[in-house]
Amino acid sequence: MYGRTSRRGGKRKMNNRKIKTELINDNFQNFKRYGIPKAQLVIADIPYNIGNNFYGSNPMWYKNGDSKNGESKLAGKAAFNSDFNFNIAEYFHFCNRLLKKEPKKAGARGRSSDAPCMIIFCAFEQIESVKNYAKKYGFKNSIPLVFIKNYSPQVLKANMRIVGATEYALVLYRDKLPKFRNGLKVDENGKNIKGTGHMIFNWFEWKRDNSKVYPKIHPAQKPVGLLKQLIEIFTDEGDIVIDPCAGSATTLRAAAELNRNSYGFEISRDFYNKAQEKMLNDINLQQTLI
């Protein structure tokens, strides 16, 4: 259906363990072909279903950001190739199959278990719909996340109304609270060490990446720094992270820098090639050298 597929990645050693980073040019629905292991965390930015209006309030709609110059090539364009045919039911079916099973035992009193979870970035208007679909596939629980920017892309509306400067996501999990790492340490008796561990609020600062380090590839690209924060909270080194809608592969880059195994799917050949060349190339070179 999607033509010839490609997969490229690399391995490197971390404490005598091999860490793998692999991006696959195929639809996530075909995951069985690739023998991918079960994930501790699935994290993805699903299409927002706003179609041709993605750049609607953004100056990028016009050449050089000025309406006097006429419309740019981005006018009337969607951010995602799948913005018109993304099947959220199939997405949750995939996630349910690829996440690890629930642990039999809950965590110690006052601590989380090692259960897996998924994080879905979505539009504010999609939150209730995403939660309802998630429940149908066994993800009964959710935690909302808010990301606060110090800028807004809606420049063209600045003198007309309040502009958007937030992004949203949901942490979805089945039954037990998912693995949670907040810096808490335990002693040899398994008791919490005072002074370790800290509260993690459900809002985060959205800090833009340094473009010289992390090039902009995809219009809806999420900052590597932010993704690293989330990955550190819900996984340990050596765990597996999967991004079914990888785009620019920033999730894979973030996971690799934190010594997590990662796999991603991207159906666009163009984004796949750019991600390999610009986002993952340094990682793959390091892995090859090691």
Residue ranges and their predicted role:
Residues 275-276:
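Conserved SAM-binding loop
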